[in-house]
Amino acid sequence: MELRLYDTATREKRPFVPLHRNNVRMYVCGPTVYDFAHIGNARPVIVFDVLFRLLRHLYGAEHVTYVRNITDVDDKINARAARDFPGLPLNEAIRNVTELTERQFHEDVDALGCLRPTIEPRATEHIAEMRDIIERLVAGGFAYVAEDHVLFSPAAMNAANKVLPRYGALANRSLDEMIAGARVDVAPYKKDATDFVLWKPSKPGEPSWPSPAGIAAEGRPGWHIECSAMSWKHLGETFDIHGGGIDLVFPHHENEVAQSCCAFHTARMANVWMHNGFLQVEGEKMSKSLGNFVTIREVLADWPGEVVRLNMLKTHYRSPIDWTLRGLEESAKAVDDWYRTAGDLREGRPADAVIEALRDDINTPLMVAVLHGLRNEAASGGVDDVARFVGSLRLLGFLAEDAAQWRARKQQASGVDAAKVEGLIAERTAARARKDFKESDRLRDELAAMGVVLKDGKGADGKPVTTWEMAR
């Protein structure tokens, strides 16, 4: 089956045909580095990591470029820097905040089993490209200067030639609908309520750079222009896939399309637009006011990254996901079982059925069902069945540790005394050898009360062997 992806722009699932088969290009909006990423931020990271892995499998790792940006210039960053480092000059405080937060983000997503993108550009390293695009937009009549701001005019875009897309087409809204449905800044320097900022003057002490379009005062970029500049620099005027959360469709992605298409006179910025659905916690929208706001780091303190990863992938990426304790517990049991079944094997080719599930618009619920079937085949089959199961899991970012490491980390997290457990198992083994099954059962119950699950089997020499792990 061919790869088919749902395109937000056309609102249909259609075959994916890369612009250049030997250079498949994908851009995904990354974090604004001012605070710990919350669990909802993990969803696009995991979803597009799976797509990245699939594209590498289909086209070859050397033929796929994945760009995910770092936004390191933003009002939220300025506010956090002033709050956390009041005794430092603002620029130095900002550097402390962005470097720390970026490092925390990388630690979190690494723990989730995500590959690093091919390129991870920072906004502040692409100011020249932003100014270049802004100059083109002003020269083309799509943007104008007012009170040291540069603003983009959607009305000018929609009045232009038919090569350009209509502003609002991605979000499937008219200009009137966008005005009515959004909190629009109607600053007096705007010609129209829908106009949005490309560049603005910096306040004293804020980060600033020489301004475009003949503006004497230094300033800084608006949010939307950053992604247009970084995607252009690293992927070109038009590329294959642009991804992000559903909340970014409007205004962020709509404005990216407007800036890029008008600057380069193209009909498309990206051939396919993909958006993941919202995340809610125990049936409610996640928010600090409800007390259910959870960071990735907080979740990882209680659950292994592979458990979090599986819990995300059990729901199709376009559907809303309900983040629940029960779901995490079920995912933990599944990952434990996968490690037991895989044993020490870490090589193998992925099953065709897994690839076919992913070819169908990254159908991860079907993929998970296939994995459970492969697990059953591996548990009762031969080494080829285990290898196919392992290869499938490895492709998807699972089995990052060997089985012994997984068990040891789980045991350590439980706080159980491993030496005591081993001693009780030895006593039970001796009781079984002398056929004292009452004592054997008593010891098993004692271990179960400690949260220890026993698995009786035979070693290579045919003698009885008992292994153990902690129950979740």
From Swiss-Prot:
A motif ('KMSKS' region) lies at residues 285-289. It comes from Bradyrhizobium sp. (strain BTAi1 / ATCC BAA-1182). Belongs to the class-I aminoacyl-tRNA synthetase family. Signal peptide: none annotated. Zn(2+) binds at C29, C227, H252, E256. A motif ('HIGH' region) lies at residues 31-41. ATP binds at K288. Binds 1 zinc ion per subunit. Monomer. Its EC number is 6.1.1.16. SUPFAM superfamilies: Anticodon-binding domain of a subclass of class I aminoacyl-tRNA synthetases (SSF47323), Nucleotidylyl transferase (SSF52374). This is Cysteine--tRNA ligase. It comes from the Bacteria. One of its GO terms (biological process) is cysteinyl-tRNA aminoacylation. One of its GO terms (cellular component) is cytosol. It catalyses: tRNA(Cys) + L-cysteine + ATP = L-cysteinyl-tRNA(Cys) + AMP + diphosphate.
